[in-house]
Amino acid sequence: MNRPHQYFTIYDYRAAIKSLDNFIGEFVGSKFREEALYYKFLASYEIAINSVQSKKYQRLMDLKQLHNNIVRYYPETLFEEDLSKKIKTVEKEINTFAN
């Protein structure tokens, strides 16, 4: 879990996501899976929010799906407060595309 965290701290979100995907796939039953999904959400959030308009909507929708997966697998996640704040921002951004 160190490498994905290092990528995240140096703002290399794409590398962090790739590394986290590898970790999640290789260590399915890991006690760090919840944290890995959370960091994947954070990295995806940064990419989606700062995306160009042509890619933003799809990235926001993917992020919403990732949030739903986290909440489904970890209904009492330790990161619920932060996830709730960020998903509200995501939903506001998605709504701007509806208008």
Residue ranges of predicted features:
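Acidic, polar-rich low-complexity tracts and alpha-helical solenoid repeat scaffolds
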Residues: 1-99
